[in-house]
Amino acid sequence: MRLHSLLFACGAALLLTACDESPKDTWHGYAEGNYVRVAPIGGGIVEKVAVKRGDLVKRGDLLFKLETTSEEADLESAEAGLTEAKTTLREAELEYQRKVKLRAQHNVAQAEVDTAHARRDRAGAAVLTAASAITQAKWRLARREGRAPADAIIQDVMFREGEFANPNQPVVSMLPPQNIKVRFFVPEAELGNIKEGGKVLLTCSGCPQNLSGTIRFLSTEVKFTPPVIYSDQSKEKLVYMAEATLDETPRTLHPGQPVTVSLLPRPAD
């Protein structure tokens, strides 16, 4: 009876050990995201927050808007200046044409025609200057808005309406799907099995089957196994960090999620 129990215990121990070991060319890792943080160029009071955590946004969508009282006043003033400049130009053009006709009748000196011509040119230049002022005012007004630079998922909103955001201080953090990658760790003895550009199979909870990726980076710096994938079998292993981008990014894959990475065989020539 004791012999039977001993054999059973030994068999169970061997089975547990075998199950805990990773198959050849299979490594452990996790998903990681490169977040995009959208900040205003100039500081100001946050007037509107148009998104919340978890929202899906398209490129160009409004994320937030700062108070624009001063910028709107500048634009209104610039538009009024353009209207006035155009009126002055019309009057200067009419006066110039009148002087030209009078000169043709020998009723005015050429100097008066030249003066009217110069006045018309100055008025034309003033219109261009006023139009440029409007362009600048609209540009400053647009800088008070934060818009999505790409399709993404909103990860965090750092400010509420009414709070003051400093220049270049992020208001919204977002994660474009293409910015998700998988970081994994390869034992020193298996380093020769992978290379940049190689294809891998990615397995994770809730992810679709046959999810593939491409190895984009392989570190040249060796380190001990990170705590995030620490186990009794790997605690003494020296590993190299590698990163793979996903050929297709499922919405079920999130930063920090454990991922098993397996090397895919190279296609036959």
Q: What does each model-found stretch correspond to?
A:
Residues M1-T17:
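Sec-dependent bacterial lipoprotein signal peptides
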Residues L15-A50:
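N-terminal beta-strand block that forms a small beta-sandwich/beta-barrel module immediately after a flexible targeting
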Residues K24, A50, L56-I153, M158-E161:
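Amphipathic alpha-helical coiled-coil/rod segments that serve as protein-protein coupling scaffolds
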Residues Y30-A31, V46-A50, L56-R59, R140, ...:
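Surface-exposed patches in structured soluble domains
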Residues A50, L56, T68, M158, ...:
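Exposed loop and linker-edge segments at protein-protein interfaces
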Residues L62, T68-T69, V113, P170, ...:
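Short, surface-exposed secondary-structure boundary micro-motifs
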Residues L128, F184-S212, S234-V261:
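Surface-exposed connector loops and short turns at secondary-structure junctions
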Residues E221-D232:
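Short, solvent-exposed secondary-structure boundary/capping segments
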